[in-house]
Amino acid sequence: MNGVVARPGDKDTVPADKFKKASPWKIGMSHFGVSANTWATQMAAESQAAAKSDPRISQFVLLDANLSQAKQIADIDDLIAQKVDAIIITPVSPTSADAGIEKAINAGIPVIVHTGLTKTDKFTVDIQGGGENFGKVSGEFLVKELGGKGNIWVLRGLPTHPEDINRYKGLLEAIKGTDIKIVAEDAGLWSYDYGHKVCETFYLENRKVDGIWSSGADMSRACMDVFQQYGAKVPPITGEVNNGFLQKWIESGVDAIATEYGPEQGAAAVRAAVALLDGKAIHKRYVYEPDGWNLEKAKANYRPDLSEKFWMPSSLTDTDLKALYGK
C-alpha cells in the first residue's frame, strides 16, 4: 500500500520463518463493525478481495463485532478455536482485543492489528493510519484558514474507538497555543445520518461558526448538506477522501481539505498475514501518515462513475469497484 512505511525509530522485526506454514491457509478477521459506515464496509470488501485473489488462502473467515466489545472478545476466541493460521483484528476499543491478542499469540497464531491502537503490544504486526496525524493535518488546515483564531464545531466519530481518540488528540495538538475555540462538540458516529443531526443541531443553536473539524467518514458531507439546506455558506471544513465528499467539494468550491485514510488498509493487513505465513521477515510496526488532499488532487481523483460511498485509495479492481459502487 502506497505510503505505508516502517514506523520511524522502531527497529522491532518479525524474524523470517517464525510463522512459516505450508499453504493452503485459513485466515480469520475480527472486524470492529462492518456496517458502522461506508468506509468500514469497503475496508471489509478490500480485505475479502485481497484474500480471494491469493490462491494460497483457502478460507477467509470475517466475523463482525458490530461495535460490541463483548462480541469482539467472543469473535477472537471463536477464531482461535477454529485454528486459523493468522488473525487480523480491527479493535472496537483500545482494550477490547487485548486479551484475545495474547491468547492467539500464546496459541502460536500471528496477529495483525490495524485501524485502531491497542493497549497491549503483544501483537505480531501493527499497521496504523496515524490517527493523530489525521487530526493534526486537518486541524492545521483550520488554523491556517482562520488565521489562528475563531470558533469551530467538532464532529467526533465513535468517541470510544481508538482511531477517533487519536484523531481528536491530533486536533487538540494542532490548535494548542492558538485562539481557536471549540464551541460545540458531539459524536456523529462517523455516519451521514447522525452527522447530519449533530450539525443541524449546532446550526439551529448558533449558526455563527468560523470552521468545522470533522473526524471524517460521512459526517463532513452531511454537514455541508445542512448548510446548503438552509441556504447558508459552508465555512472552512475538514473531510476525508470519500467520493461523496469530493463531489460536494468540487461542486461548491468551499475551502476544505480531504485527509487520507484508505480502506486499502484491509488489503494491506491480508498481505502482511500472507508474508508472515510465507516465512518473510517484516517489521512489527508500520505507519501510514499521508498529507491531506487539496482541491486540485480531489478533481484529479474524483470518480463520477462511482457512487458517493466509494473511498480512496483502494486496491479493488475496476471491475469490483463498478460492481459495488457503479451508478
Language model features with spans:
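A residue-level marker of the well-folded mature domains of exported/periplasmic proteins
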Residues: 1-327
